[in-house]
């Protein structure tokens, strides 16, 4: 086993994924601390700044996009590299928005560890990245709103399709399918709740136009 060095913060709300990443990275020799959402992550960062942050996007209290935006508008944390992990935000437009926030890399779930670990090692070897000009508050919330509205529309389409399909399945098939449908409905609730929050913040944010 090749031993690596570095202080990593892993931010993930799903316990199984969080535990897997923590155990794997510790096994490789990294010092690892964990958080379950963006708010916890900011508390950890305030105590000791990590060399690299690995963060999910869709999380309660404070999601990954908001976490990175907060980091980038603070000069003291602006240059901490961040790797996004996501199973929900995987469209090219989602990735483009993530990179516009200042993400270093974007990796789709499920995480392929043999690919993931060399990426982490390479980022740490490259050192502190070039500082990215952060989006202003209005640009951030407006861009995020657009992403969430698309996600909500896609989730509604998926649920409507699955609800029509379930009546055509056998009883055995329905059991597993219902669990998947229930999960999709919960995800829709999370997306809608977050969208409501972003819309409210957007209404209270004044657009800041760049000088012509």
Task: Name the predicted role of every residue range.
Residues 34-43, 64:
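Helix N-cap/capping motif at the beta->alpha junctions
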Residues 59:
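Receiver (REC) domain active-site loop signature in two-component systems and cognate sites
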Residues 111-120, 132:
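C-terminal output helix
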Residues 126-186, 190:
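CheY-like receiver
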